[in-house]
Amino acid sequence: MAKTEIVNQLDQEFGRLIESLRDLINSVPPDLLYRNPPAVSIAENILRSAAAVEQVCGGITVNLWDDPFEWTLPETLSNAALMIEYLSEVDLARRRAFNAISDDEALSKYVSVPSGEPCRLAGLLLDTLVTAADYRGRALATIKILSGEGTQGFII
């Protein structure tokens, strides 16, 4: 097994997630992006997904754990083009973070997180990937609800 096989796989999964968020934005009519169903809007779920990735990648590379909430507000990222631009910034942060991980052994190291409890890098990355993918799934479900497809065929 190569020294960076796991790191590369994690990097690819985060890259796929960001790319799927771009595809999702491009597939949604502009009037639906911030339309609110009984839950959170499509755009807000997409941005929460990307923000989770941005926060962890910023924490890993420059120990900046700020919540991207302020610069991911609907007023700031008000259309698909601005959201795509933000995803490019998140993708750049992802690349920097994964370039900083030297090999698979580095994933077993502990990192300091805002909660004060150190955690293993691998666990932090996996938790973030799960959280970001969950928000992506919520965005997809909201698209189905708003487009009238309902929840038939959903696997719960």
Which role fits each region the language model picked out?
Residues 11-12, 22, 30-72, 112-156:
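Short, contiguous alpha-helical
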Residues 3-6, 34, 38, 79-83, ...:
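Residue-level recognition of alpha-helical structural elements
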Residues 17-24:
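Amphipathic alpha-helical packing segments from all-alpha helical-bundle domains
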Residues 75-112, 119-138:
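Acidic/histidine-rich alpha-helical segments that form the ligand environment
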Residues 26-33, 103-106:
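Short, flexible helix-adjacent loops and helix caps
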Residues 1-13:
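Extreme N-terminal tail/first-helix region
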